[in-house]
Amino acid sequence: MILSNVEIHRALDEGRLAINPEPLPRLPDGIFDCPYQTSAVDLRLGNEISYFKEGLPFDINLRQGPFVRLFGPNSVTQVITEEQPFVLRPNRLVLGKTRERVSLPLLANSQSLAARVEGKSSYARCGLLVHFTAPTIHAGFEGTITLELINLGPCNISLYPDAPICQLIFESVAGTPVRNDSQFQG
């Protein structure tokens, strides 16, 4: 079951979910944009963009081991600012992270939550994808959310820190999950 904005607030208050810093305001106040939609919350782009070095002399072999071992020594990380955004050219893939840290704790006596990261429709209409095939944020996750940013449009897209880049949709998890660490968690 997808959580409403009211249930997202309740989960934050009860400790079944943590977002740091917490998106504010919780309700529309007429001054600031409210990051809580009826069934999602907006998250912002952090200040680092990472990408494979250009002109690498190899093909990616998915059987060679964990992605993080391949990506680390073959990538560049660029800090972006309001004065120096990252310009995402058409047909280019980069990795970004959310400004916010998200925690979906595994709970024994309460219903755990999982989430899906989705793009913002206004950005999608410009050709920007924020996840390619990896929308799932599993129960037990803690950290910033990695975004696979792809420009499928015909024009360059400037990426600024703190732009509302994606939205999280939360769902209840039936039963108590057993922790299963991955290359990105654990």
Predicted regions and their residues:
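DUTPase catalytic domain/fold
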Residues: 1-186
